[in-house]
Structure formats: structure tokens, C-alpha cells
Amino acid sequence: MTEELRGTVRKIIFSSDDGRFCVFLLENKDSRKIMTAAYRGSAPYVGQPVLLRGCWERHPRFGMQFKCSALENVKPEETEEIKLFLASGLIEGIGPSMAGRIVDRFGRKTMEVFEERIEDLRQVPGIGRKTLEKIKNSYEEIREEQALIMFLQSLGISERFASDIHKKYGDETEEVLTHDPYRMVRDIPGLGFQEVDRIALSKGVDPDDSDRVVHGIEYMIARALMQGHACAPEESVFLNTSLLLAVTEDIVRAAGKDAIEHEYIPSVLWNDKRYLYLPSLYEAETESAIRIRNMMDAEPLGSSKLAIEKFERENHLSLADRQKEAVQKAMESGVLVITGGPGTGKTTLVRAVITAARQFQKKVRLMAPTGRAAKRLSLSSGMNADTIHKALEAELHDSGSTFFSRNESDPLKEDIIIVDEASMMDISLFYHLLCALKEGARLILVGDIDQLPPVGPGSPLKDLISWGKVPVVRLEHIFRQKEGSGIIDNAARIRHGDMCFPDEEGEFSIYYASSEMDAFGAVMNYCRQLDYGSELMKMSMQVLSPMYRGTCGVDHLNHAIQELVHGHPVEGASHFLPGDKVMQKKNDYEKGVYNGDLGIVWAVDKNKIFVRYDGKEVVYEGEDRNSIQLAYAATVHKSQGSEYDTVILVLLPTQNIMLKRNLLYTGVTRARKKTILISTDDAIARAVSRQDTESRYSLFLPLLKGEAKK
């Protein structure tokens, strides 16, 4: 049964990064009781009076909460309500004490004063002409924003985006909404086509309008990118756009063909089919193919025999023939791929290549896609290694796009670039890396092709190997190691599609769970036994799961382990405490922290969270606090590029969609010393037997082969 609740927002417990879900505490206007409310939308302001519509439900972990189907900002009426609203910090020039003085002077008529005769605020001690002007301008801005919010909320647009729209366009907001609404897709990060389309239609845009149709086509291409595709077949794009916009396919085809003819929508022809791109991905695929082909004509540097002998002598080892071959090819080729699983000698080979490069007085630069992968590369090579983003001096623009300062105009100075964990690079990052190489520079890509594909579009490492023109060194011989041999042996079994088994040394163990709750209990027991809450284990151990949702999903595991670590219940699903292990969710170039970086919370106050990362401290305040998440548990995808002494990997039949060989292989190989697999025979069998056969729409390989035409 739907109920209405009115009250004042007292505290935001959780606000999702995309502004689509929040949990907050509400002080009920009638009972004055504090209650929990959940809303699928952006979080309201603390101190804001709101009217909620919804129903009560019992959350399995957090108890009774009011599930809002609608949230409406309302004007404060009672004096206490007004005081909380004014003291919230929304209005510039008014703090808690000033709010009290204003309400003491005007009582329940305070908001009437703000609306109709704001000059009367001069009667309040402490408000002079300058302060009044500040209050007046700030309140007027809030009024305009609130009016816009109410209009957009009626169309299902979240408050967060309404605020962003108002900040971006100011006095021109109405003009943009009425005459050029689709520019908001480009201008407002995170605001999607469907939300903008609702605004446009409400403002009278013709459903058959060609501008609307072309933006719909772009939206469908962008959706393909989210599935890992770099482009999409014209026919499927037109069909899906027709269904999305509820217009005939003929209308879509006419608008689409016109946009393609005028090169507004880039396209490539391959095998008698046309594939459509967004401009940035078109440039990435076509230009990357040209650059790679041009790099194939590199002049050999000479024999690496002396360098190999020097390396073997200094390190008291003998390189395998395949490793020696790789060192020589690195000195001969413009582009080289080195691929192999754990224990096959990739790290040793990188060090040998560095020695050979120095023989020829060549400067070397080491990179990796993630911070943890770069740190591992640095430790194993004895040389500094950076993330690719840091090496290319990436900056985030207001539009949400990334600009790389290192490019054709200001390339990297080094002669040989070595990229580890190269299988993680999508085609866009790969392209920007190629743009940053100076004339004559050599590129060596090191990676494990059997791991998960990139999160972003394309799979350039796989395509380079498939092309057959780039020299590829496959390291297959497993060198015996004192630690982790049980992990390496089982990883090899998985890679070949065979079942994995526990080893006698206990480096690879399997807990066979009878149910999802049994698996959850096993995770918690192992965390207790291994003392996950200790400072040492927090960073050397990791719990992994394929998915965020579910009893054994990352979200639930994180909260449960957090409570285990602290020894008491923790309020809210995103409440941080000193000592918590956290992960940065997106690249922040100003702070110098990157997607996947792990840190420890060392202090928390009312509005700030202080996190220690390796070698630096970062402060999060305001909306920045949504840039981190608990990291006691993480997805296998997020762990790629990282290694830990101990890994607990959960893999269950209920996670069926994720049960694939490369995911199991990637999860298992994150551990150096000990892997604990919590699973069932059926889930393991399904995972090892199911290869990721889903092909991605990408024309990088046909473009390399010269088979595709612009």
C-alpha cells in the first residue's frame, strides 16, 4: 500500500556514483522519529524538506526502510524545518547560527520573506548589504534549479542531472532544452540519450525528426561499445534504433544513410557489410592499423648475443632458447608480442630485453594498464614503471573525455616501450599509446592472452597475434618455482580445458560448497582463520567474485567482511571506517590515483575521508567520496593486473552467466602463494568447458589485413 511521508533529510548514508540510487535518514515531520529511506534517484540535500511516496519493506540486512517510488522537494513550513533547511549550507552566506537568527526574527513567515521581500533580511543582525546580495543571488539560483529539477523529475530525470544541466547552461538552460536538447548528451557526463529524448519530446520535438533519429543511431552504437564492441553492423543498428524510437525503419534508414554520406557517422565496409562507429573509435581503429603497419619496417639494431651472455652471467641463470629468440626479436622488430601464462618466464625475459636495449644505448620505458600492475613490473624489473595514463600525462576534461598530453606533437622520448598486462588494453588506449611513440620507437607488448579481454572496446593484443605479421613469442615451458607451483599447474590445466585439483602442499585448495549460504559461510570462516583484518593481510589477500549482486556477490561480501573486521555492525552499505580497505573506482588525474588502486582509510570526519595509498595520502570530500568503494572483495575483472599472496575465489552455479574458462583462469592466477577456490564440481566443470566465444565487433584486424575499406 502506497504511503506518503514528509520530513527533513538528516544524513546521506549511501549515494551511488551514477546518481541512480541513494539511502538516507529522514526525520519524520509528524513523529520526529529518524527513519531510513531508499530511493532510485540522486540523493537529496541534507536539510532539504521532502515528500516521499512509497511503502515500507524489510531489508534482509538493514531492517525496516521506506522504499520511495517518488521523491519531491517541498518548501519548509515549520520553524524547525526552516531552520534545518537554511542551516544546510545550500544558501551561500547562511550558516547554522545565522539560520537561527533569521528564523527567530521571522518565524513561520521566513520562506515568505525569501520569496516576496528578501530585502527584509537586512533586519537580521549580521546581514549587511554585501551579505544580503550574496544570499539573494544564491537563493535565486536555488529557486531556478529547483524549478528545473521539478520539471525534469516529472520526466523521470534525476536531480543530479538537473543540477548539472543548470550549472552548465545557466540562463541559457531553457533555450537549450527547447531548441537544441540533444547537445546535452555530449555536454553532460553520464546523461544518456533516453533521458534527453524524453526532454526533447516534452518540448515538442517531432518523433520523426532526423536530428532525433541520428542521435538515436549514435546511442545504439554507444550501447554496443558497452558490450566491448568497437563498432556495430548497420542493419542491426537501424533495426534497434527503429524499435527504440518507435519510428519506421525507413525513416531511420533515410536519416542514417544521409548521416553516413555526410560522414557525420563514420563507417567501414567489410565483407559486403557496413559497420558504424562513433568518431573516436573510428579514429582509434583505422589509425592504429595504419601506425602498426608503418612500424613493421623497423631497422634491426644488431645481435643481442653479448647482451644475453652478460645477463645470464650477472643473474646466474641460463635463458631458454625461446627466451633468447624473444630478446633478439625485440632488437629487430618494430612491434613484438610476448605471451605466456604464469611461471613461463615473462618477467625474466623483460629484464633480459632491458639489458639488451642498454647494449645498444637505447632508452626503455616500462608501463602497465593499472597501478598495481605497474608496481609489480617495477619491482620485478628493477626499473621505474608507470600506468599508461600517467606515462601519457592524461587529463580529464570537463566534458568527461580524457586528453593525453603525450601525443604526436609531444611524443615520449624513449626508444623502446614495454607494456606489461597488454591484454587489458582496449583499442582506444592502445591508439593513444601509439600516438605517443616517437618516430622509430619500438613497442613490446607482454601479456597473457588467455586472461579476460579488455573491459573497453576491441581486443588489440588478440588481433595483433591473429594478424600473423607481428612477431609473436609464445612462452609455454613452465619453470619450476618454490612457491605457487600448485597454482601454476592448475592454471595450466584450466587453460587447456581440464579440471583443477587440490595439491598436496595446500597452495591450491578447493572448498566444495553445498549451497550459496554455505559458500558465504566458508568465505567468512577463511577470512577469520587468515586474519584478514590484520594490517599485513589486508593488502596481501583478496576475496574475488565474478559478480556484484547476490549472497556471494562483491557488495554483500564487502559489507559482511567489513563487519567481521571491525567486530560490530556497520551502518549503511557505503559507510567507511578507519582501517577499511578501499578501491578507487575511476581515474583521477588531479589526485594521482587510478581505477583499481587499493588503499587504507586512516581517518574519517563529517565530510572527509582520508585514504593512504602506496606512497601517498588522498583526501576525499563532497561528491569525491563516491569515487571509492570497499575492497575486501572485488570482481575478477577489477583484479586483473594485480597479484596477491592469497586469493579466495568464489565461483558458484548461481553465477552461471560468468562461468567461463578465462574468468576462472584469471581469478586463479591472481595468487602468488595460495588460492582457495570456493565452488562446486558442476560450476568448475562448466567454467573450464566454456570458452569465451562471444566475438566482438571490431575491424582492427581486417584493417590490418587491408580487407576493410573506409
Where do the language-model regions lie?
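Accessory, non-ATPase domains that flank or precede helicase/AAA+ motor cores in DNA-metabolism machines
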Residues: 1-302, 710
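Loop/turn positions that initiate beta-strands
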Residues: 47-49, 579, 596
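Conserved helicase motor core of SF1/SF2 NTP-dependent helicases
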Residues: 352, 356, 360-362, 368-380, ...
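Conserved helicase motor core of P-loop NTPases
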Residues: 449-591, 602
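C-terminal accessory regions
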Residues: 496, 597-710
